[in-house]
């Protein structure tokens, strides 16, 4: 390590297959520039001579295969590690690349080289990533996805997020899926899997994604496992529909990021197993990756190894233990980023910094505040606001409100919980009345998110914050348990 000029500017020379790890404090930012060599952040390459900006308590690492020199301004907690799991992750990528090539050859009817024929019909990788809290599952998904799109074969794998506490490309509480055509950048925990095109206003971000989003509305899968199961299967139907229309694109495969509750012994084992099975069925999984958890690996081997490949992979030593307060701050960052865009102040002396390679001005938004009548928007809550587990009900008792029942929310009623609530605005319902059904809104995708910032009881009006000025009159929205907090 060397210092150049100011104490705020440092240079690190990294040896091959080492990584520079950093953790940012609240309110700080870090600018990194690749001086020479090659480097990547979770599989996304850095361009030489360009400043990359990180903020919002980002925790990440710059890895190099062949060695490099990097310069940074305003570092926080930082160190270099010679022990990384990247060789194991690269081997996984090579194995998945072979599966993609075989699947594509099968689609085109091309013969495989002698000795390369698999014992069964070649299938693309459909990967389920499991692991406990703070194991680095999302990072593994990001690295494998980035290596696929960098392979030069025009792969566009589908990246699926079924972790409602993460939010992925939209807001916390969402489950979503998106085809990935370019490397996913890392610059803020508010955008853990990159930026959606819907949050790029003035200039389309070159790596913007177009996700399909469903609304679960809570950070914890235990809150409503039946709804989780249904939404996972809805995502699976979207995957299958896409592959029916794009048989060649099917060869790119699917990578599924999961919540830590899928590996948690504190979660009801019955619910946990059902949700894992829902993912297995919905996405037709053929590979399970277990990140650093021996007991879970044995459990998956016993349950699924007869028809899928189960692989235990190492957890990175750079994974940071995240507490509950940090996760709540990240949820707040995500909601503000959805409404106002990504706003990170560059360190002094830097005027050309980028967020994941994109200009800072391209990622700033101006949301719209508008006043609507209570009756202009139909608002529902799925199930009762508080609901005991079925096992806690008296013997023979049944619920008055089922876990899957849409319950209308009246803004004029005290205790509605609407003030500062996050609402998921749904896509239009089926115009054919004969095709309607009671729980249809559970199967509708999300077209955007709203925040209720004020309730006027006497005027029977409410103020909503939205990313744009589009009308919401006559539309339907669902509320969950997330709330807006001013920064």
Swiss-Prot record:
It comes from the Eukaryota. One of its GO terms (molecular function) is polynucleotide 5'-hydroxyl-kinase activity. Its main location: nucleus. Keywords: ATP-binding, mRNA processing, Nucleotide-binding, Nucleus. It is found in: Nucleus. GO terms for biological process: mRNA 3'-end processing; tRNA splicing, via endonucleolytic cleavage and ligation. The keyword Glycoprotein does not apply. It holds the Pfam family Clp1. Required for endonucleolytic cleavage during polyadenylation-dependent pre-mRNA 3'-end formation. Belongs to the Clp1 family. Clp1 subfamily. PANTHER family: CLEAVAGE/POLYADENYLATION FACTOR IA SUBUNIT CLP1P, POLYRIBONUCLEOTIDE 5'-HYDROXYL-KINASE CLP1. This is mRNA cleavage and polyadenylation factor CLP1. It comes from Laccaria bicolor (strain S238N-H82 / ATCC MYA-4686) (Bicoloured deceiver).
């Amino acid at each position: 390590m060397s210092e150049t000029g100011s104490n705020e500017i440092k240079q690190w020379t990294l040896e091959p297959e080492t990584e520079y790890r950093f953790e940012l404090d609240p309110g700080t930012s870090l600018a990194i520039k690749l001086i020479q060599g090659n480097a990547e952040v979770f599989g996304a390459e850095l361009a030489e001579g360009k400043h990359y900006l990180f903020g919002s308590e980002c925790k990440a690492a710059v890895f190099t295969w062949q060695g490099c020199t990097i310069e940074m301004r305003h570092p926080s907690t930082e160190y270099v590690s010679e022990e990384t799991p990247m060789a194991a992750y690269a081997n996984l990528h090579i194995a998945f690349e072979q599966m993609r090539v075989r699947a594509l050859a099968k689609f085109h009817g091309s013969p495989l080289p002698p000795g390369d024929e698999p014992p069964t019909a070649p299938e693309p990788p459909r990967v389920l990533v499991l692991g406990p809290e703070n194991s680095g599952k999302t990072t593994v998904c990001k690295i494998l996805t980035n290596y696929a799109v960098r392979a030069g074969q025009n792969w566009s794998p589908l990246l699926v997020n079924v972790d409602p506490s993460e939010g992925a490309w939209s807001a916390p509480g969402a489950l979503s899926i998106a085809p990935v055509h370019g490397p996913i950048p890392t610059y803020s925990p508010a955008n853990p899997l990159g930026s959606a095109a819907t949050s790029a206003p003035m200039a389309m971000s070159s790596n913007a994604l177009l996700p399909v989003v469903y609304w679960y509305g809570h950070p914890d899968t235990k809150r409503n496992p039946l709804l989780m199961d249904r939404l996972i299967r809805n995502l699976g139907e979207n995957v299958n529909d896409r592959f029916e229309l794009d048989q060649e694109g099917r060869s790119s495969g699917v990578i599924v990021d999961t919540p830590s509750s899928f590996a948690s012994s504190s979660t009801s084992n019955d619910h946990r197993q059902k949700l894992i099975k829902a993912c297995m069925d919905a996405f037709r999984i053929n590979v399970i990756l277990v990140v650093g958890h021996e007991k879970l690996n044995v459990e998956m081997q016993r349950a699924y190894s007869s028809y899928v490949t189960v692989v235990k992979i190492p957890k990175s030593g750079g994974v940071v233990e995240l507490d509950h307060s940090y996760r709540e701050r990240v949820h707040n960052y995500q909601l503000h980023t959805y409404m106002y865009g990504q706003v990170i102040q560059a360190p002094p002396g830097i005027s050309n910094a980028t967020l994941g390679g994109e200009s800072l001005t391209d990622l700033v938004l101006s949301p719209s505040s508008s006043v609507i009548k209570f009756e202009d928007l139909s608002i529902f809550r799925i199930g009762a606001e508080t609901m005991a587990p079925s096992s806690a009900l008296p013997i023979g008792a049944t619920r008055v409100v089922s876990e899957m029942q849409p319950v209308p929310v009246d803004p004029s009623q005290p205790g509605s919980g609407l003030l500062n609530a996050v609402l998921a605005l749904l896509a239009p319902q089926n115009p054919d009345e004969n095709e309607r059904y009671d729980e249809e809104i559970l199967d509708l995708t999300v077209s955007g998110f709203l925040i209720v910032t004020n309730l006027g009881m006497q005027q029977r009006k409410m103020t909503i914050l939205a990313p744009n000025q589009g009308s919401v009159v006559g539309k339907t929205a669902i509320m969950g348990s997330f709330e807006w907090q001013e920064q």
